[in-house]
Amino acid sequence: KFCPEYAIKEWNEHNFDINSCGYVAEAYLQKKWAFVADYVRFYVLYNEGGIYLDTDMEMVRSFEPLRKHKAFFGFATDGLTLPVFGSEAKTDFIADMLDDYHKRSFIKLDGTYDTTPLDVPALRILKEKYGLIENYQYQELADGTAIYPKQYFYSTDANTGKITKYPELFCIHY
């Protein structure tokens, strides 16, 4: 409706090699699909570029204004929100996220799972390597990445479930 020229691609076991990353292979064998998807979203954007959307996202306007950035993300109430973000192919930050996953195991030495939410390493890397300031305001980083305030991508109150339709909002996460 808002981006009719965009192609929607589904990624699954038929077009993604589950064994390409040890963390992913372990999460897949444990049937922890969300952690598989966390890696795949970065893998796809690194290799193809594009805009990632969780399946429970509803666009409310075109993403076209965001394409001027090398990559874009949004702040949430606390940290980053990653059910939607976009990137050109082969960006350094996305490569750094993939490297982070390749250095980790999903099954830790004590047998428990590494269920670190993907926004934790993303925020750490953006702050340490790219100069992000966690002030929840619009920022353009030196590499061409833009970080938007929460009202652009994060409209659902985590405690009440209430959705606020900010004028700046691009999509709603249900």
List PLM regions with ranges.
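Glycosyltransferase-associated regions of secretory-pathway enzymes
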Residues: 1-37, 53-174
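Small-residue hinge/turn detector
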Residues: 39-49
